[in-house]
Amino acid sequence: MQKLPEAKLETPFQTAALTVLALCTYSADRNIGTEMLNWLRGPRPLNGQDISFLNDRFRDGKTYLPFTYFAGSTPDNNYTPTKPYSITIESNHVSGEEQGYMKLFIPCGGANSPRLIKLRQRGSDGKWFLGEQYLLTGVRTPKSEDPWA
């Protein structure tokens, strides 16, 4: 991930997109995903509570959760994104209210409203790091897992 152009972390949008990528990786390999998330968090790595939260969200086969943020992902196609893969990241009137922080929003194919991710800028070099993410909250059940579909 660190070889991608977005890994310069020059904008909060780059860091937000890489966070979705890291969460996708975490769903497949927790060790590599943890390394990626720790790198994105900069001087504030994941603690035990953070890791417990992540493990809880991916419990019961919910590995599809981070894929709901890719274009084309819907419950009807079991959150299979269209190619080429793309993610939309939005800002709004509250995004830059707090100095050194940026609140961004990522539309989700399994929810009615975009989900929040909060980034923090490091003063010494201007790079943007992951502060908080609210991307792993409940979404509509994929069609293949919905007994009512």
Locations of the language-model features?
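Surface-exposed, charged secondary-structure patches
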Residues: 52-112
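Ordered hydrophobic segments in well-structured contexts
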Residues: 17-22, 86-88, 103-105, 114-118, ...
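Core segments of small alpha/beta cavity-forming domains
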Residues: 1-71
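Short beta-strand edge/turn micro-motifs at domain boundaries
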Residues: 107-148
